[in-house]
């Protein structure tokens, strides 16, 4: 077993008292009072995680699944907005091409897996098969059932290879999803988020409920468990989820070295600036 995987249950820098503090402050985000403060604290810790990942060559995969409008994109944005996209890479694959449809189902996801020193975040993943593909009839019931049998073995192989795998399902109530969908309809800046597929998923709430229940039941294992994130409160969901990620990875803080800028070179005596450059108008 890879060291990164073998150490998962050991204490790391994000200690129990930190998790308790995160949970306490998360409860206060209902009023929004401490959200910015807590998020900043968590994002600073993510920067330490990034340094550790780069130093040790760790490989991490974080899967986000969930209801439409549950806030997956919002959580992912808060994880990645203060770190390097060269280390934290977000994968949101479109519908498979005709060529990809002829490949092994997992193949296009495997191609996105991390190299040493990378964290790959899947904004929806191979779990499209027992979710949207199954409910919408894009795959047969036989293929969906077969996927549910294979997925735990596939993920066991990932972990055996040294990948740290975390799986999160963002859950939102019927009432809150309804409110968010109607908010999108009435807001020109959010209408683009409401696709025909979203509308269809709204209508098939209970079909999705059955599919997701079986998906989680069949693919929740001790090595690759599903973690449910209650998401009716977006801010609370974000800080709870980020705190859990930090508590689940056995990273250690890496000392940041202050860079020495040295002296900047002097302007050459023979340098003449190019006065023909086009400059954006100063309107503000």
UniProtKB/Swiss-Prot annotation:
It catalyses: [phosphate](n) + ATP = [phosphate](n+1) + ADP; [phosphate](n) + GTP = [phosphate](n+1) + GDP. GO terms for biological process: ATP biosynthetic process. GO terms for molecular function: polyphosphate kinase activity. Residues 1-32, 260-284 are annotated as: Disordered. Belongs to the polyphosphate kinase 2 (PPK2) family. Class I subfamily. This is ADP-polyphosphate phosphotransferase 3. Uses inorganic polyphosphate (polyP) as a donor to convert ADP to ATP. Can also convert GDP to GTP, with lower efficiency. Keywords: ATP synthesis, Kinase, Plasmid, Transferase. InterPro entries: P-loop_NTPase, Polyphosphate_phosphotransfera, PPK2-related, PPK2_PA0141. Its EC number is 2.7.4.-. It is an enzyme of class 2 (transferase). It comes from the Bacteria. Residues 1-22, 260-277 have a biased composition (Basic and acidic residues).
